[in-house]
Amino acid sequence: MTTKPERIIIFDTTLRDGEQCPGATLNIDEKLAIAKQLARLGVDIIEAGFAFASPGDFEAVHKIAQTVGTENGPVICSLARARHDDIKAAAEAIKPAAKGRIHTFIATSDIHLQYKLKKTRPEVIAIAEEMVAYAKSFTDDVEFSPEDAGRSDPEFLYQVLERAIAAGATTINIPDTVGYTTPSEFGAIIKGIKENVPNIDQAIISVHGHNDLGLAVANFLEAVKNGARQLECTINGIGERAGNAALEELVMAMHVRRQYFNPFLGRHPDSEEPLTNIDTKQIYKTSRLVSNLTGMLVQPNKAIVGANAFAHESGIHQDGVLKNKLTYEIMDAQLIGLTDNQIVLGKHSGRNAFRTRLKELGFELSETELNKAFVKFKEVADKKKEISDWDLEAIVNDEIQQAPDLFRVELVQVSCGSNARPTATVTLRTPDGEELTDAAIGTGPVDAVYKAINRVVNVPNQLIEFSVQSVTAGIDAIGEVTIRLRYESRVFSGHAANTDIIVASAQAYVNALNRLYASLQTQDKQTEVTA
């Protein structure tokens, strides 16, 4: 990737920067599931993690490199600070990939130099040069980021970039680390780099931005107009603080407004060639997968993938859409993988019909996963007259993409009413196989269930978020529950779906506790090793 592409390179950092969002902790299997889906989506580069950060991160990057980093698959990248041990760990982690990249960085803004690094400008230039060259000794594909470039002195930034490229960097990434710039300012930064870094034609200009002022996507589109050819983004825009630039918004903005962006890439305005390598029909499925596994709900009015993105309440709008969708919709929902073809299954539907419909919806399940999902399908079909595609999606996500199965819900029973004190009895199977039962009184049925579960699990935690969403309409709709709980300074999420919202609430809570419990077990093992 040392030559200027005629299209935009999509660099997905959902598994690295996106996972830094509080509560979005993922285990290795979940990261692998997302990485596989990102490959189907068609991203060019997957930043699989920060290999040096922890043994778990290293293993995740290594496993993704082994499994997803095929010859025809995406480039697998690991982040590394501008330090020898970081870069060495990154190189080792990405080694199994057919195409690997090391992404190293050091801050260049005066505030970071003074307070964080406590280094002078010449020292930072020397470190950048040395560490890029060191990374280059492991792989030809090296990306360099001057952290907080948006607040860096332009002249100093040009010097650092020139030396990094001379040392072997093939991609120069310009991060707006704190989401501080406006579109015109960010565009000017990219333009300045194009005009003032003598060897810039030897590298691809990339951009990375946060959404603190809600301007990340707008900044990136302005950067494209000024010469940026790689965009670093996340699914659903998840990430630290207010999040990152959203992949789905960037891709669809350039797809819908292709005639506007074509000339900036040297194309004829009417060219129909896609500006990215993304299979847009995989966008919605990828969004749902990331939302379910991270526990980060997508707001209903979120552009492109929100529940209301293609909904119309106004009578005038509804009338126009019925006559011609283009009156009030600038894109077809089918472009992102939504479909009006809602084939309905029921309790008499067989395993073959179930398998066939899941394949049509894009789910690729192993035989074991299919069996688990089919058992759940039959349970739901006994309670629900018709099972829609939305229900199938919820069933698969709930059964297949779950937390470690340490504690298991065996029984949930509640008693409540207008003049009764809400009481819950729960039975959990422990990691040792023992069944424990306890009961509790709460302010409501869910509170009572959670108190009873806590009495069994006995791990202190604080529930900080509880939300319920209906998958479909109707009194027999499946309800999806997402919860987040805090243990010390860490946040863990849980997700579950069921036609009984109390059962879904119990399962979601246990899923979050299982993530917490697994994390504590990992900590204990690491403590034993270092002791």
Curated annotation (Swiss-Prot):
Q: In which pathway does it act?
A: Amino-acid biosynthesis; L-leucine biosynthesis; L-leucine from 3-methyl-2-oxobutanoate: step 1/4
InterPro entries found in the cross-reference section: 2-IPM_HCS-like, 2-isopropylmalate_synth_dimer, AIPM/Hcit_synth_CS, Aldolase_TIM, LeuA/HCS_post-cat, LeuA_allosteric_dom_sf, LeuA_bact_synth, PYR_CT
Q: What is its main location?
A: cytoplasm
Q: Which CDD domains match?
A: DRE_TIM_IPMS
Give the Pyruvate carboxyltransferase domain ranges.
8-284
Reactions performed catalytically: 3-methyl-2-oxobutanoate + acetyl-CoA + H2O = (2S)-2-isopropylmalate + CoA + H(+)
Q: Name one Pfam family in it.
A: HMGL-like
- EC number(s) on record? 2.3.3.13
Q: What does this protein do?
A: Catalyzes the condensation of the acetyl group of acetyl-CoA with 3-methyl-2-oxobutanoate (2-ketoisovalerate) to form 3-carboxy-3-hydroxy-4-methylpentanoate (2-isopropylmalate).
Q: Which family does it belong to?
A: Belongs to the alpha-IPM synthase/homocitrate synthase family. LeuA type 1 subfamily.
Q: What is this protein called?
A: 2-isopropylmalate synthase
Species name for this entry? Answer: Trichormus variabilis (strain ATCC 29413 / PCC 7937) (Anabaena variabilis)
Designated gene of the protein: leuA
